[in-house]
Amino acid sequence: MSDPPDYSLALKYGITDRASGIARATEARVRMTDLAARVFGDKQELDVPRMTLMSLLTRAQAFHDGTLNAARSDNPFASFTLLRSYAENAAILIWVSEKQGEIRRLYPGAPVEQKFSIGKLLAYAENGSGGFAGIYSQLSGFAHPSAATALSGWRATDEHSLVSWKSTPQFKTEGDFMLACVWLIELADANAQLWALTWTKYFGPNSEWDAPSWPETGLSR
């Protein structure tokens, strides 16, 4: 997505090539699940509030694993589109970690009018963490037909003034591949920290908030 590629951010995470990018991103996945396991503890009661928040962790792991598999397959479209969904999951966690009771809007049977607006979530995330909207916009460039993908499949060759085309997807540059790994690491760490914070606020030993009950008035099983 950058031309010429900028490797400085990748180097910050110890990424120097594709193999190290995949390795660092895999380590980030382990950190995410390890943190969740520590926060979760050995035994938990199961109810809809807990199950709802646990499902957000499942979504995070799904997007992480899917992005890793897509990157290994040299598929930038699937990689960046899944990263976009991963970012949306982080945006929801930012919202529910800071707004008491809003987790109820994700409960089964929640009214349609309570559905989250992605635009509103992104604006809120941008206010708290500058740069979120810019990254999301870049990811959206691959999720939708746009100028960012206008020359998909085309690549410069080692021979002077020659290009090649393949119908199968491929990352345009090594920098793009490593950038996908960087974002994967950052989103894994963000989702992990936000999920742990939200869980602790609702269900930790020194919980600050009471989880909204289910079903509430207006919700149906």
Model-predicted regions and their roles:
Residues 1-82, 88, 92-93, 101-221:
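A cross-kingdom marker of C-terminal helix-rich interaction/assembly modules
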